Regions:
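Short, structured segments at the rim of ligand-binding sites
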Residues: 1-126
Length: 126
């Protein structure tokens, strides 16, 4: 079986859109992970502040993503696809978030270094 790779070579035009969603843990985590892969600044108002969402933020910060969190807004300075910057033998703590553990893995696939994802006792049993 042959594998074919393709790359998107056309630049996407800069755009500015506002989306309103309910404060949902799953959506908040996915938004953080997606915007970490964008180039530029992404903002979310009233992002959910659950333990799982905060675990996602800490994991992304360890991967070199700059994130500013205030009482009303979260700002992510995206690094682009495969733009993470980190040291060898990195350990990411997903806490109790299976969503963070599962969804961050594909973003790390191109890393030349070993990255260990850990969690609390509950997550480690899953």
């Amino acid at each position: 079986m042959t594998s074919k790779f393709f790359f998107i070579s056309n630049k996407v035009k800069k755009f500015s859109k506002t989306f309103e969603v309910d404060g949902d843990k799953s959506i908040s985590i996915r938004w953080l992970l997606l915007t970490s892969q964008a180039i530029g600044i992404s903002r979310a108002k009233n992002l959910l502040r659950s333990e799982d969402v905060l675990s996602a933020i800490e994991c992304l910060k360890k991967l070199g993503v700059k994130i500013r969190l205030s009482k009303t807004e979260c700002i992510v300075f995206g690094r682009g696809i495969n733009g993470f910057k980190f040291k060898k033998n990195l350990v990411l703590n997903a806490g109790n978030s299976g969503t963070v553990g599962r969804l961050i893995l594909p973003l790390l696939i191109k890393s030349p270094y070993k990255i260990k994802i850990i969690g609390d006792k509950s997550l480690s049993k899953r």
